Amino acid sequence: MEKPGMSLLKGSLCVIVFLLLLSLVESVKGGGYVKYGTEAKVVPGKLNVHLVPHSHDDVGWLKTVDQYYVGSNNRIQNACVRNVLDSVVDSLLRDPNRKFVFAEMAFFTRWWEEQSPERQEQVRRLVKSGQLEFVNGGWAMNDEATCHYIDMIDQTTKGHRFIKQQFNTTPRAAWQIDPFGHSSVQAYLLGAELGLDSVHFARIDYQDREKRKAEKSLEVIWRGSKTLDSSSQIFTNIFFVHYGPPTGFHYEVTDDYVPLQDNPRFDGYNIKEAVNDFVNASLVYANVSRGNHVMWTMGDDFQYQFAESWFRQMDRLIHYVNKDGRVNALYSTPSLYVDAKNVANVTWPLKTHDFFPYADRAYAYWTGYFTSRPALKRYVRALSGYYMAARQLEFLVGKNSGGPNTYSLGDALGIAQHHDAVTGTAKQHVTNDYMKRLALGASEAEAVVNSALACLMNKAPKGGCTKPAIAFSQQCSLMNISYCPSTEETLPGQKSLILVAYNSLGWNRTEIIRIPVNDAGLSVEDSSGNTLDAQYIPMDNVTSNLRSFYTKAYLGISSLQRPKYWLVFKAKVPPLGWNTFFISKASAQGSNNHKHSSVMLSPMNNTTEIGPGNLKMVFSSDSGRLERMYNSRTGADIKVDQNYFWYASNVGDAKDPQVSGAYIFRPNGSLAYPVSSSKICTVTSAFIGNGNVQSKLQIVRGPLIDEVHQQFSPWVAQVVRLYKEKEHAEFEFTIGPISVGKGHLTGKEIITRMVTDMTTAKEFYTDSNGRDFLKRVRDNRTDWHLEVNEPIAGNYYPLNLGMYIKDEKAELSVLVDRATGGASIKDGEIELMLHRRTSMDDSRGVEESLVETVCVNDTCAGLTIRGNYYVSINKVGEGGRWRRETGQEIYSPLLMAFAHENKEKWKASNTVKGYAMDHLYTLPQNIALITLEELDLGNVLLRLAHLYEAGEDSDYSKIAKVELKKLFSGKMIKEVTEMSLSANQEKVKMKEKMKWKVEGEAEQPSSPLRGGPVDKSTLVVELGPMEIRTFVVQFYQKQRRRKLFVG
């Protein structure tokens, strides 16, 4: 019998089952194929959300370049750039509306070479259609704090010319999304002057970002150059947060993301929620932007290894968001985005100056990397100058298609500019790989140099030069620690040591050459047979000990005999030319014009003055430290105390857990500790052979150089040199191994500090990538009111050329030999950070502490650094000339090659002095020749740079002229074509720069002083202040080898 209500229940169940079946039928009907509408374009009057797919692919960081490309060593990081490019191209070919941007040509060229002709043609079509866009287009995404502008230009040129040759296109957008702060030179020189329309990046100070969000000033018109002003301005897009998409819209295949589920048959159907989330996130972006366009960066580090995981989701987003209609979503690129911004006719805020220093939050200033891994930074800078000289010589003799060339060094240097390479922020094994690449490239370039010099000097060949009769021995890359076998050898029989010095600058130069020798009875002659004044300086123990350890560590050899002396002499070398010097055993009858230096170990006076020339320095005999500098010619005179200190690295404190590491500089308080007590250590004589004499201050005097040797602590030593014909002091420092303790002393950051009596009102000046100088004000930012939470680290700035302070009477200038950090923490002070050793990781991704060691067998020690900085004092307004000219000499030292041969035999078969230019011509003192490189078909890339800013010097901040006929006097010039900075397009064919409305300004473009067009008959190039001009020069090919003037 049926219970009451049972029939009613059965009827209800039937209805429910029926409804469920009906729902299932409808679900099946809605779960079929969907053609997604991805063809969206900009819609006027609507909020347009530009989706820009990208993959940020570091050219080395946690893995080496090759490991990142092929996808090996994935236990460290799952990343394979080959997979990214393979996968992206496949995805782009599936839908003509999809787009993608790629930046790093060091990776793309590797991939390109592996592709079939058919695949290459597919990619060319993708580029032509705008689906694949190259952004930046350099060899790497260069750093902006630790790179020299010449390196930045070179690596960009390398990538841009590849893109032009293979795709006949030119990048339009700078894509500097990850560097840790942004320089004014990157904006105006590697942006506007390249012909780019915009620059895009993520990292700015957290305080600056919040203010810009509130003011809707994340997008600005940036004028990075005071001299070039609005003529080199560029539209700048600062991202809302990082360079990834908004939260919830990240779709890498290996990530745990929620996919867009538009099939109602499946659990998790979420299209309505996804569209709402998209619209809401878009409005958040719109609320901090001007106009009706916002950009979403759809990608992150090494993303798109399975590109469909991204594109499938973005296809759905675009389709359903646009069906919803509240906002418009579209595939886009930075160029399309900026085109839309430009058409919108909005008025934009103005930005000047730069974006340094960068802090991503309170107590976390990214100013440590300005100095991290100083040995790598020096190697990069030294090889940069060498690369410039090697390419000049390669051009002078003509490229040897089958022999060694400079390509490998250019490739290694291009990679080294990456923002985790020269910065010193990669893992140790990756840093080792960077160094190895540089060393291999340098070795091949050295073969080019030796062969080219031998060829140029050889009198025999009339046409080309196949195999020169002479062979130079290995050049001496470890000369700074006195290791140079060519100069140390006992001269055999009637042979002399032949030293050929090449000058890559366009000016005559006089330099002091120092070589290690063992023989005290040598004579030096120049190419004219004149016996030169020279000076012997006894070899110091610090250098000898360095030599013993590092030749064993680097070369695997035990140097039994250490050289006893430095032989020092004055060398005059013509511009773009060479001179030969003959070091021979002196005859018993004649004078060798050589003076042995006098060594004074314990001065009896209260003070000791040194200086064989106009610049004098006064040292305290009691403390052993510098007290005063003055120039007897100019009258500039300051009191100055110089010492070495260390900051204790912070290991986290009550304020914040942030520690000091490879990226972050965070000292444990504001106190810097002297490396010794108030006085310099009393130590055993600094020189070999002087027994155990104790002294605080040890003086070397001679006709060419005076030196002061100081030992500040067992691990910090210094030599100060004053030259007879130079008006600056050279400080050679030796720092390390840095000892660290436990607990709160687990890291030390070493500085040198100069304390003067100058009144500087918080102001100091630092260079931007070796180019412009920018005014800095302590505890101040030009764009916002700074909340000071790190008074030391927050006042450090990057240096590539140097810094200076000034008051009403004088300027004190310091130039550096590598990228480093500098500051003026108190009025009248300059400090440079020279070395760092931190024992904790700073939680920015590298997951290693900054501890560099060098091992011999099983004995390891912390890395010792040796380097130089250069100091000058001048009357106010007169220091610019010294900074510019000396800066060029530091960047481009004399290139030296060695051989052993009979002097007369050498003279008979070789041109001992030669000039590539007209022998009566030099470049103007305000012009630098920064590129002279043979391209294909004998064409030559020529790049000239004006060295001065407007108003920097009364004589040199003017139009300067270069006569190309005299520069290339040995060849007949057929045609001169002015190019863009990266030589990827003719200057006259560059598209007109975008015009922008700027707040508070009428539309009146500035007219900086620039050079005019090159007259085809006179071939004279004009350059205005801060102008760089690039040309491709063609010659009539009558002779392969350059005609040279002989001295």
UniProtKB/Swiss-Prot annotation:
**Mind listing the UniProt keywords for this protein, alphabetically?**
Disulfide bond, Glycoprotein, Glycosidase, Hydrolase, Metal-binding, Signal, Vacuole, Zinc
Query: Where do glycans attach?
Result: N280, N287, N345, N480, N508, N541, N605, N606, N668, N780, N857
Q: Which residues bind Zn(2+)?
A: H56, D58, D178, H419
Q: Which interval of the chain is the signal sequence?
A: 1-27
The free-text note explaining how the cofactor binds reads: Binds 1 zinc ion per subunit.
Q: Which GO terms describe its cellular component?
A: vacuole
InterPro entries assigned to the protein according to its UniProt record, in alphabetical order = Gal_mutarotase_sf_dom, GH38_C, Glyco_hydro/deAcase_b/a-brl, Glyco_hydro_38_C, Glyco_hydro_38_cen, Glyco_hydro_38_cen_sf, Glyco_hydro_38_N, Glyco_hydro_38_N_sf
Fetch the Pfam families from UniProt: Alpha-mann_mid, Glyco_hydro38C2, Glyco_hydro_38C, Glyco_hydro_38N, Laman-like_dom
Q: Report the record's disulfide bonds.
A: C455-C465, C476-C484, C855-C860
Q: Which SUPFAM superfamilies match?
A: Families 57/38 glycoside transferase middle domain, Galactose mutarotase-like, Glycoside hydrolase/deacetylase
Provide the protein's localization.
Vacuole
* EC number(s) recorded for this UniProt protein: 3.2.1.24
User: Which cofactors does it use?
Assistant: Zn(2+)
Tell me the domain of life.
Eukaryota
Ligase is among the record's keywords: no
Reaction catalyzed: Hydrolysis of terminal, non-reducing alpha-D-mannose residues in alpha-D-mannosides
Q: GO:BP terms for this protein?
A: mannose metabolic process
Family that this chain belongs to: Belongs to the glycosyl hydrolase 38 family.
Assembly and interactions?
A: Homodimer.
Function description: Liberates mannose from p-nitrophenyl-alpha-D-mannoside in vitro.
Entry-linked PANTHER family:
ALPHA-MANNOSIDASE
Q: Write the protein's name.
A: Probable alpha-mannosidase At5g66150
Which organism is the protein's source? Arabidopsis thaliana
Top-level taxonomy: Eukaryota, Viridiplantae, Streptophyta, Embryophyta, Tracheophyta
